[in-house]
Design a protein with these regions (language model features):
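Extracellular/lumenal mature domains of secreted and surface-exposed proteins
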Residues: 437-535, 676, 698-699
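Conserved structural position at the C-terminal beta-strand
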Residues: 83, 511-513, 659-661
Length: 699
């Protein structure tokens, strides 16, 4: 269990680092006040390209010194620490669980079992009325089986490590039988689970509840990873409900939460068999992450069941799955395709932060019965602080009563379908868009362009009786409606700003009304501000140009973007923007060269999106490069959309631009967005591109 990938100390005292699954490690310790945390990576240069500490809402930014990072943690928290953009199934990630001390063990009695610290190779099979207390440091290699029991409590601070015998190449994890999940239940009632860590190394559904009711999970930590990167949901309901999940952490390799009426395999008979209702689920105050798929997935093609009263609130979406499995992945993916049947209502998503995410909502209900389908879905106070959506949202079919109430990207509230963006089709009713009603978080700053050490004045929009808290993305914070701040460096919040000579800082504003947070009387705003450490001068104004870009085509069967300096283009041309004519080739790399016209001096962020692989270079500096291709699954063609960004300090005028894009299995050219002084996040317009004119003299 012990990991050598990281060395961790808390207030100078070493803390054991354990290996979880895949390339994930974790540490767990208790705190009673603020602490200083030090993390040293075994790999040389591990942190050189940056550090990403989530949830972003906390505004944590470490100090980096070689292989070591250090940061201050003010209160108990569950953190994910990795390198920027590295959060998929092969990512090297460290999860830090800083908790409050557990309750003392219960008094001895005939129905009380105390499991001491150490290794125990056996499953837990409590009977009705039993209490099991796992001491800190107790490791159970097995399962927690809750079959036809009631009144069970599992308390303490122990760990269950599940290493099952499931086929790693397919889904056998759906089966409902003992020793098949970290926690498995059937027809169980009134169960309390507190302080438990689940490590899941097999390709199985991590926590499965069939026809079970009145479960409460508090301070649960679930970490799953498997080579197939699939079928390892965080928590599934097969009928039942009445569940509360609070103050918990999930890292899944499939949907974090799955809701079905039943699941007895993939045969025609099993898929078409009607399932039982799922009702009354509350998930709150939790951190949610997956390497693939959705955060919440109710429904499946052709399945019949109903569900009501699901709430996810006051939580952070650290990592959403990218790509698609028949349906694009999202915060909510409701896949009621191929004549699924049922009524699903009263789903609420409230006070949620979207850190690394893909799309907001995908809802499809292809139903031909008289049931009312999907209705009463509310998305309220959804804050995406620092990344745009990578895919459109969709409402399709028998859907009504969808409301988007203060869905906010940075400082901008979505008030139209185009703002999300959202496609409504096949009879779905148009959604309602609303803006915040009580307090509003919105701010301005001056000057619009600044460098290291310069004073920046921040002014929040006034809300009567509100309190204002600023997190500047450099590890510092302030209170008050109007504050001043100096940024001490140009490395950015993620310490990834050195290459371009400028760093992007994620500035957050939290506004709380008179009645306090958690009541709907709060709002957040965010903006990425670029601190310029080094200016890039514009090209000579004497250069004569033509509109558009030049391009070259490099045929090849690459699976990742190659080093094109070693390749030979077969033909070339010019185009208005990032388009090219491959002249019949279907697998190739394209290169575009030219100039990009910067409208004003300032710190700019460039956002790069592409499916097969792309690279953006400005003034000879690599600004962004998307990650390796990530295949979509379940028959969805092509690769998922990948994303990267970078910041630069650019003088007004023309700057050289070089773009590379691979075309292997997906359609579409790279997309480049920019933002800067008085320039909101938007696609770089065609008019910004040009290339140097070359006159040819003929005799």
């Amino acid at each position: 269990m012990r990991s050598t990938a990281f060395t961790v100390s808390v207030n100078g005292q070493p803390v054991d680092v354990a290996h979880a699954a895949a390339s994930y490690d974790w540490v767990s310790f208790d705190v009673t006040g603020p602490v200083e945390i030090s993390i040293t990576a075994a790999e040389a240069g591990f942190w050189d390209k940056g550090v990403d500490i989530q949830p972003w809402r906390l505004g944590i930014r470490p100090v980096r010194q070689g292989k070591t990072i250090r940061f201050h943690l003010a209160a108990p928290a569950k953190l994910s620490i990795s390198r920027p953009g590295d959060f998929l199934n092969n990512a090297a990630m460290l999860f830090v669980f800083a908790g409050t001390p557990p309750q003392p063990p219960p008094r001895a009695g005939p129905h009380v079992t105390i499991i001491a610290a150490g290794i125990h190779r056996e499953s837990l099979n409590p009977k009705s009325g039993d209490t099991i207390y796992l001491e800190p440091g107790a490791f159970i290699f097995g399962s927690l089986n809750l079959f036809k029991v009631g009144g069970v409590k599992v308390l303490g601070r122990g760990t269950i490590v599940y290493e099952g015998t499931q086929d790693p190449t397919t889904d056998e994890g759906w089966m409902q039988k003992p020793d098949w999940h970290c926690i498995g239940s059937y027809d169980a009632r009134n169960v309390q689970i507190e302080g438990l860590t689940c490590i899941v190394r097999a390709r199985t559904w991590s926590i499965q509840m069939k026809d079970s009711f009145q479960f409460t999970y508090d301070d649960l930590r679930v970490i799953g990873g498997n080579p197939g990167n699939a079928n390892q949901d965080g928590m599934d309901w097969l009928g039942g409900g009445g569940t509360i999940v609070r103050n918990s952490f999930f890292r899944a390799s499939d949907d974090v939460f799955g809701i079905q009426g039943n699941w007895d395999g993939y045969t025609e008979e099993a898929i078409l068999a009607p399932g039982k209702d799922v009702t009354d689920i509350l998930v709150e105050d939790s951190e949610l992450s997956t390497s693939i798929s959705n955060i919440v997935r109710p429904g499946w093609p052709r399945k019949t069941f109903s569900s009501h009263n699901f709430t996810l609130r006051n939580s952070d979406i650290l990592h959403g799955g990218i790509g698609a499995c028949g349906e694009t992945f999202a915060l909510l993916g409701f896949w009621g395709a191929e004549h699924a049947h049922g009524e699903h209502s009263d789903y609420t998503f409230e006070n949620l932060f979207l850190d690394d995410w893909y799309s907001l909502v995908q809802m499809e209900m292809d139903q031909d019965s008289a049931l009312p389908g999907l209705h009463g879905f509310t998305f309220r106070n959804i804050w995406a602080p620092d990344q745009p959506p990578l895919a459109d949202s969709n409402l399709s079919g028998d859907i009504s009563g969808v409301a988007f109430d203060n869905v906010k990207y940075g400082q901008t509230v979505a008030t139209t379908d185009a703002d999300l963006p959202l496609i409504v089709s096949d009879g779905a009713k148009a959604p309602i868009f609303e803006s915040p009603k009580n307090v509003v978080a919105k701010f301005s700053f001056d000057p619009p362009v600044f460098g290291v050490g310069q004073v920046v004045r921040f002014t929040a929009e006034a809300s009567l009786g509100a309190k204002y808290t600023w997190l500047f993305g450099d590890g510092t914070e302030a209170t008050g409606r109007i504050v001043s701040h100096r940024f001490a460096d140009a490395e950015g919040t993620m310490l990834d700003g050195e290459a371009g000579g400028a760093g992007r800082f994620r500035v957050l504003l939290h506004v709380v009304g008179k009645t306090g947070s958690g009541t709907g009387n709060e709002d957040w705003a965010s903006q990425g501000l670029v601190v310029v450490g080094k200016w890039r001068e514009a090209a000579s104004s004497a250069i004569q140009t033509l509109p558009g870009l030049t391009w070259q085509i490099f045929p090849g069967n690459w699976t990742e973007l190659p080093d094109l300096t070693k390749e030979q283009a077969v033909f070339n041309g010019q185009s208005p923007s990032l388009s090219a004519n491959p002249q019949g080739f279907v697998r190739y790399a394209a290169v575009w060269d030219g100039l990009i016209d910067i409208p004003a001096d300032g710190g700019y962020t460039f956002h790069l999106l592409d499916r097969d692989g792309a690279r953006l270079v400005i003034d000879g500096v690599q600004v962004a490069r998307t990650g390796p291709p990530f295949a979509q699954v379940c028959g969805s063609p092509g690769n998922a959309m990948r994303y990267d960004r970078g910041a630069m300090g650019l003088r007004a005028g023309k700057h050289t631009i070089h773009v590379e894009g691979l075309h292997s299995v997906s359609e579409g050219a790279p997309a480049i967005y920019w933002e800067g002084p008085a320039l909101p996040l938007t696609l770089v317009p065609v008019t910004a591109y040009s290339y140097a004119r070359k006159d040819v003299v003929t005799r």
